[in-house]
Amino acid sequence: MNMTKMAKANEIKREWVVLDAEGKTFGRLMTQVATLLRGKHRPDYTPHVDCGDFVVIVNASKVVFSGLKLEAKEYFTHSGYFGSTKSQTLQELLEKNPEKLFRLAARGMLPKTKLGRAMLKKLKVYAGAEHPHTAQVTK
């Protein structure tokens, strides 16, 4: 009887994937990123093991949104104190900190566990075209 092979954490060979966000739709790009971070594109995918690849996103500030999302969509933060709710529109967040925008979207698509936090650490986002990971990049 053949048993299904389960990947072990020390057997996984991770790759570095660079994605250029310029001119791409945000949501479609982020689903691709979540799949790569989770490792679901691999034949040895195991749900309880972090088997995803490192993902480097460049030109994050040049990503495209459909519809009126730039003006209408809002992101809220709350410190826990009364009256401390702050909101930013998508356009403000994209101009000030595009890295945070990509990290928030990826966090929503990954598991809400220790494993998900480990997966999120493998996401590297840069607003411009330059990144310091040229030595590691394989794809």
From Swiss-Prot:
GO terms for cellular component: cytosolic large ribosomal subunit. Gene3D superfamilies: Ribosomal protein L13. The keyword Ribosomal protein applies. Signal peptide: none annotated. The keyword Ribonucleoprotein applies. Keywords: Ribonucleoprotein, Ribosomal protein. InterPro entries: Ribosomal_uL13, Ribosomal_uL13_bac-type, Ribosomal_uL13_sf. Transmembrane segments: none annotated. GO terms for biological process: negative regulation of translation; translation. GO terms for molecular function: mRNA binding; structural constituent of ribosome. It comes from the Bacteria. Belongs to the universal ribosomal protein uL13 family. HAMAP family: Ribosomal_uL13. This protein is one of the early assembly proteins of the 50S ribosomal subunit, although it is not seen to bind rRNA by itself. It is important during the early stages of 50S assembly. Part of the 50S ribosomal subunit. This is Large ribosomal subunit protein uL13.
